[in-house]
Amino acid sequence: MIHDPAQLEKERPDRLRVLWLSTLAFTLMFAAWLMFGVLGVPIRKEFGLSDVQLSWISALAILNGSLWRLLAGILADRYGGRLVFTLMLFFTAIPAYLVSRAGSYEELLLYAFLVGFAGNSFSVGIAWNSAWFPKDQQGFALGVFGAGNVGASVTKFIGPALIASVPASGYLGGLIPGGWRFIPFLYAVLLVLMGFVLWFGTPRKDKRPGQGRPFLDMLKPLRYVRVWRFSLYYVVVFGAYVALSAWLPKYYVDVFGLPLHEAALLTALFIFPASLLRPVGGYLSDRFGARRIMYWTFGIILLASGVLMMPEGHIVLYTKQGAKEVMQFTMGVELFTLLVFLIGVGMGIGKAAVYKHIPTYFPQDVGAVGGLVGMLGALGGFFLPPLFAYAQAWTGLPQMTFFVLFLLAAISFLWMHLTVLKLLQQEAQHLKNDFELKGDRPC
């Protein structure tokens, strides 16, 4: 990594081009990755699918968007993010187009799985931007790039209008498909165009921190426990984000009886802070330190989910005089939305804080470490919805969705805090067994 101020200033325009174009590309990839959440309704109607069959389409896309993040990050470090990201854009365009031509449920499953490859672009962008930005700017840069998560809402906003406006027969004699099939076709075209823009719009001389290093050598950092601890943090702030983005519309409909379009809009009040506040989290991590921001993150999530997991009923209070007071507890949609918004705020700043740790501890291995952390975090988005469903089925309480989140956040917080205490003891050995105040020193 370059530390010469003159060289850093000279490369500033190149850094910014990498940042903004990679962010735009990632937003598009994220939109294509999660497009089946909105397309599910017309797909189910056309193919006569059950809820379980439909759920597998999105699940396979999410799964494949997780599996290759480690490898993608390593390849970006070794061959440069410009090449790897461009190839991923072109590759993802192929199954996106094939989705628009799918004629059976089995074909949809296969093509959705392949489209899911788009989710792995996150690791490429993280490694790429880390290679270009100096340490004191990495938190903000990675936060800006990660804000491409807002692509999760793109199809929610443009999808229904486009599906309704494009004729079912399409255009040019069906060459451009109509109805729901127009959306994956449009994404396929945009992905190809974005591939050319990224290739010709970013510096030809790329940064390759892993060039020439043996592949196994790039995997060595994965033996450190802190890598797996960071992964658990990311399950909380990203895996749960992906899971709740898919789960909340159903929750609003089932628990509060809202129509689907209102449920989708209220879900966006969770998605936007969880995505767009990522640059803020990066800036705060640069200024105050990533660990302190993680304390804030877990505090917000624990507080909000702790209230949300409370079932409706009565709270019984006893005074000192023995009097009994009974208070009815109900969760209105306004309070629920506010608390979910707060969880989104915590996740938004927390995602950037997790990734701020990585170039600090592993400056030469951001691709491998960031890839593993991203992979396990995204796998959380695959496994958490079934956990939500089982918790609700076992208890009969929809609020148990947030008990799962509370438990996961509590475990992560406890692990982090015990690690911090251990670090403090190592830095101040003399206080380990002698921590009482001496004389008149103030506390």
Swiss-Prot record:
Q: Annotated Gene Ontology MF terms? A: antiporter activity; nitrate transmembrane transporter activity
For the keyword Manganese, the answer is no
Bilayer topology reads: Multi-pass membrane protein
Where in the cell? Cell membrane
Q: Provide the catalytic activity annotation.
A: nitrate(in) + nitrite(out) = nitrate(out) + nitrite(in)
Q: What happens when the gene is disrupted?
A: Mutation has minor effects on the ability to grow anaerobically. In contrast, narK1/narK2 double mutant is unable to grow anaerobically.
Entry's Gene3D superfamilies? MFS general substrate transporter like domains (1.20.1250.20)
Q: Where are the transmembrane segments?
A: 23-43, 56-76, 79-99, 108-128, 142-164, 182-202, 230-250, 255-275, 298-318, 329-349, 368-388, 401-421
Instruction: Check the record and name the InterPro entries matching this protein.
Output: MFS, MFS_dom, MFS_trans_sf, NO3_transporter
One Pfam family recorded for the sequence? MFS_1
Protein's name in the database? Probable nitrate/nitrite antiporter NarK1
Gene of origin? narK1
